[in-house]
Design a protein with these regions (language model features):
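Conserved pre-ATP/AMP-binding loop-to-beta segment of ANL
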Residues: 18, 126-144, 151, 175-181
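AMP-binding/adenylate-forming catalytic core of the ANL superfamily
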Residues: 100, 370, 375-376, 399-485
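Conserved AMP-binding/adenylate-forming
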Residues: 231, 276-408, 414-417, 442
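Conserved C-terminal "lid"/linker of ANL adenylate-forming enzymes
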Residues: 418, 445-450, 477-526
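Conserved AMP-binding A3 loop
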Residues: 26-28, 140-166
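Conserved AMP-binding/adenylation subdomain of ANL enzymes
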Residues: 163-181, 191-283
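Conserved AMP-binding/adenylate-forming core of the ANL superfamily
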Residues: 16-45, 50-59, 67, 84-89, ...
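Structural core segment of the AMP-binding/adenylate-forming
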Residues: 20, 44, 64-67, 71-135, ...
């Protein structure tokens, strides 16, 4: 089965369920919209095997175009909306993408590929245009996981990978039901947003309420009007919501009562005071529309106190673990079990794990194998040899432990990928390659660091004599313009000493970071 066939199956099973909630589009009507878009893209010259980019916010035309490209047998290149023209040109060149479906606001002059207005109105369905014969192992999507410059890592996911991911989501059937509304403000180009807003809704016959911007006023208005049952978000947003709720309650001078209910609510329910508990909880739950049943966190670790807050309000709060290489959620937590520190459950259906090279605390490297695990980076045999063993297990590079219940607990990242508070990933290799060529720079280490309690992308530069912070800052700022702003190094230190290296001449990032903490690099811009 391929992804378009899966859509047709869901539309036949739940024809009158809303898929695009805000627009009032039912599943049966969504299929017609996909067919009409497929006819338009066919006229534009797209054929089976072509790579077609999508560069768009969360608007209805995103999923319509996605399934239309699959209808024609194409592969979708998912493009981050926060990048630069330079990066888009590199990505399309690497993947041989000749056409990009985009909102007009993203258009720029280029001879590398052609833009197609994703909001363009479609004509009639072409009855002679049938779905392409797409095999389960054909590529469905391509995504970049290591930046667009240098030797990029492009993740191809097959239709088999995605269909199996939807099947594995059956483990969430206790909380997601046909006809539910899922709030969709996570970007669909990212694997977390794609997994919940495309795959999960498709599996359960649920609807998605697309929100193209993260505007608090619009989000609150949507919660009130549409009252979604399922709300996924990155941990940072769950923390923001929690803090605002607490601030509002304190402003009403009711925190003493709410904190008492949060602490003793379960006990009060057991002794017959459930009505009181619900009365206190109701105004808070109404913030989410009053029907919220399931809150989902992913993309980074959630603070225990944040998760506890929502669970004590009577909401189910689950966390997942996944990578682009695993179609997102390959592990899902069980809300009935104690999961601190951050735990993300066990592998889902038809997936398995091994923890290797454990230390004395039981912390080891997580390896995964299964139906959701991709087959290797596109045209990058060197990288593939490093991450797959002879038995087909994939090295995630993440450090975990396993508890007595078989649940995995996140212990840290062996890889140096920087995870910002927003959940966005920054790849040090890409930035180091960009900064190492700057005048006066001998070497550089980029890593995750805390500045005034905030996670930032930090750089330590080994420079030649005579370099000043002001001059280095100007060089860095000029280089930053090549990449998206969330990747920028704006906090840095410099030294005229050489950075510590391994025997293979690689920078020892952990030593550099420790030196920074110990104050060995006093020349800083923070």
């Amino acid at each position: 089965m391929n992804m378009y066939q899966l859509l047709e199956r869901t539309a036949q099973t739940y024809p009158d369920n809303l898929y695009l909630v805000r627009e009032g589009v039912k599943y049966k009507d969504f299929v017609d919209l996909v067919k009409a878009r497929a006819a338009s893209l066919d006229k534009a010259g797209i054929k089976k095997g072509d790579v077609v980019g999508i560069l768009s916010h969360n608007i209805p035309e995103f999923p319509i175009s996605l399934f239309a490209i699959w209808y024609l047998g194409g592969t979708v290149l998912l493009l981050d909306t926060n990048l630069t023209p330079f990066e888009y040109e590199n990505m399309t060149a690497t993947t041989k993408c000749k056409i990009v479906c985009a909102e007009k606001s993203f258009f720029f002059k280029t001879d590398k590929f052609t833009f197609y207005d994703i909001t363009k109105k479609d004509g009639k369905i072409n009855p002679d245009l049938k779905p392409a014969a797409v095999e389960s192992l054909d590529y469905a999507t391509l995504s970049f996981t290591s930046g667009s410059t240098g030797k990029p890592k492009v993740v191809p996911l097959t239709h088999f990978n995605m269909v199996e991911c939807t099947n594995s989501l059956e483990s969430m059937a206790e909380w997601i039901r046909p006809g539910d509304y899922l709030y969709g403000f996570l970007p669909m180009y990212h694997v977390f947003g794609f997994g919940v807003e495309i795959l999960a809704t498709l599996h359960f016959g649920a609807g998605v309420l697309l929100q193209p911007t993260v505007n608090p006023k619009e989000i609150m208005a949507d919660f009130k009007k549409f009252r979604p049952q399922i709300i996924p978000a990155v941990p940072r947003l769950w923390e923001v919501f929690r803090n605002k709720i607490i601030d509002n309650v304190k402003a009403q001078k009711k925190w003493w009562l709410v904190s008492f209910i949060l602490k003793y609510g379960k006990t009060l329910q057991k002794i017959g005071l459930g009505a009181l508990v619900r009365k206190v909880q109701k105004p808070i739950l109404d913030v989410f529309g009053g029907r919220a049943r399931l809150l989902i966190a992913g993309g980074a670790a959630t603070k225990p106190e944040v998760e506890t807050f929502y669970e004590r309000l009577g909401l189910t709060f689950i966390q997942g673990y996944g990578l682009t290489e695993t179609v997102g959620p390959i592990c899902i937590s069980k809300p009935t079990k104690k999961r601190f520190p951050f735990a993300f459950g066990a592998p889902t259906l038809n997936n398995e794990c091994e923890i290797r090279d454990k230390n004395e605390d039981g912390v080891g490297v997580l390896w995964l194998r299964g139906h959701q695990v991709f087959g290797g980076y596109l045209d990058n045999e060197e990288a593939n040899k490093e991450i797959f063993d002879e038995r087909g297990f994939f090295n995630t590079g993440d450090m975990v432990t396993m508890d007595k219940n078989g649940e995995l607990h996140f212990a840290g990242r062996k890889k140096q990928v920087i995870v910002l508070d927003s959940g966005k990933n920054v790849y040090p290799d890409e930035l180091e390659g960009m900064y190492i060529v700057l005048p006066g720079v001998k070497n550089v280490a980029v890593f995750e660091h805390k500045v005034k309690g905030k996670t930032v992308t930090y750089g330590v530069f080994s420079v030649e004599e005579g370099m000043t912070l002001e001059k280095l800052g100007a060089e860095i700022a000029a280089a930053n313009k090549k990449v998206a702003s969330y990747k920028w190094v704006t906090h840095f230190a410099m030294t005229t000493e050489d950075l510590p290296l391994t025997s293979t001449q690689k920078v020892k990032h952990h030593v550099v970071r420790q030196n920074l903490v110990e104050g060995k690099y006093p020349d800083r811009h923070e």
